[in-house]
Amino acid sequence: MTIKVEQAIIHEIAQTHEGQLSCRLRPQPLLNSQAVELMLEELHQSYTSKSGKGFGFFGTHGNDGEANPAFANCLKDYLDGGLGFVEFTGVASKLLQDELGKYDFSQGGFLLLACYSHMASDYLFVALLSAKSSMTVLDDMELTQVNHLDLNNIQLAARIDLTEWQADKESRKYISFIRGRAGRKVADFFLDFMGCVEGINPKAQNKSLMIAVEDFVAGSELTKDERQACRDKVFEYCSERFDAGAEVDIKDLADELADSGMDSFYDFATTGNYDLEEEFPVDKSTLRQLKKFSGTGGGVTISFDGHHLGERVIYDPISDTLLIKGVPANLKDQLHRRLKGE
C-alpha cells in the first residue's frame, strides 16, 4: 500500500419518488477493512495518473465571485477538532444536495469522502460515484444482475492537499479536480459545492516552460544533438515528477540540467517574460512536443521524433513541404499495394 487511510465514509444522494433529492447519511465511518484500503489505493493511483486535471483553491465570498465558503469552513472546523468526521461529511453531503438541486440533469450518486496520507502530505479525496449494473453467476449457476460502484469512469472527483492548504494560505493549487470531457463546465456544480475557484493553469505553465526551454537551447552554443538532449532531459524529468505525483520545480529542474552541463537555466527561465511559477503541475501532453512533432489536418496525420528533423524529415517552409527519407516499412507496404491496384 502506498497510502495510509485515516477515515472514509460514503453517503448517498438519491431522488425520492416525488423527484426531490434527499441524503441518506451513514452514521459512522467505514471500517478500515482490506476492501476499503484496496478501493482507496486504486482510486489514488488512477486519480494521480489522470492527465489534464484542473487546479484551484477555496475562494472567498465577495472576492472570488459567488464562492461559497461553507465547505471550507466546515473542513477547517474538522481539522481543528471542532467537528467530528461524520458530522463534517454530513454537512458536505447536504451542501452537495443543495447544489445538485439547482440542476435538472442530476440523478445523485454515492458521495465518497476519504482522508489519507501519501508520502509527506495529507489529503481529502472527494468523489461522486455512480452505480453500474453487471451480471454474475450464483452458486447454483444461475445468472443474476448486481450493482457495483463504477470506479473506472469517475468524472466528478477532487483532491485537497490539506498539508499545502494549511502551510501556504496563498497557494492557488492545493485543490485538484477532474475536468469534464467537455471542459470544466461539466464539473461546475461539483466545484461550486466546495467553493473551489480555478487557480493555476497547468497547460499554460507547461507551454511557457516548453517555450523557455526552446529559447534557452536556441541561444546556447550547444550542438544539434546537445539541444535535443536538453529537451529530452526536461521531458524525462517532468515525466518522472508526473509518475511520482509531484510537481515541476524550476530550481530542481535547473539543477538537473546543470548536472548535464547546461548551466544557468533557472536565471534564464525566471528572469525572462515567461510568467513561470516556481512550482506547477505537469501536463505531459503539452511537454510531449519537446520530443515529438505531430499534427493533424485535412485528412493527414503526421508524427515523428524531434531528432529526425533535418535528417530523415526535411521541412521546406518556402514550398510548405515535408520530405521523409526512409518511409516506415508498414506504410511503404500499404502504399505499394495501393499503387499496384490502381
Swiss-Prot record:
Localization terms from the record: Cytoplasm, Nucleoid
Top-level taxon in the UniProt lineage: Bacteria
Pfam families tied to this protein: NA37
Molecular function via GO: double-stranded DNA binding; single-stranded RNA binding
Transmembrane segments: none
Keyword terms, alphabetized: Cytoplasm
Family: Belongs to the YejK family.
The protein's name in its UniProt record: Nucleoid-associated protein Sama_1557
Organism: Shewanella amazonensis (strain ATCC BAA-1098 / SB2B)
